[in-house]
Amino acid sequence: IAGPIFLPATTMALTFAEFDHTLRDGRVVHVREMRPEDEGEFVQTFDRLSPDARYMRFMRFVKAPDMKRLREVLGSLHEHGFGLVATVPAADGYDIVGSAIYFLGKDPSVCEFATTVDGDFAGAGLGRLVMTTLIAEAKKRGVAVMEGFVLSENKPMLRLAARLGFAIASDPDDRSVSYCT
């Protein structure tokens, strides 16, 4: 999706095929579509993120999850975008250790992405997995252009975006932010 790739929009209902994937370090994650009932697990995921990881993800310091916004996002994905999670088994059922999401803009052929990876899974290939899966799903659903805003100091995400084919430029209005498209 990097760059201006124009695909025909699709109007057919699409389903996401869940799958298991073995990461570079041997751990196995289960990848599936986000669901509204993931709310509690997203709160736990947020709580496990370091303050620096939260800053890199939300582009500002955030002490607690915005529950209203979380419910809005989880409740509107089928109409306005798509999200996926990577999970591992946990004592309470499962933990979300990675996620990627896109939301469509006014032009339904353009979307904005965001991704999060649990710090314990950094460097294992999980970020690449959730992003490549998100990109493939966006293409399948007729998205032509994917874009994202990343803090310029978030070098791991910028390296990943570059390896995935995104063009990266500084935001002319805010040099602390890089624009990936």
Model-derived segments and spans:
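Long, contiguous binding/interaction regions
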Residues: 6-181
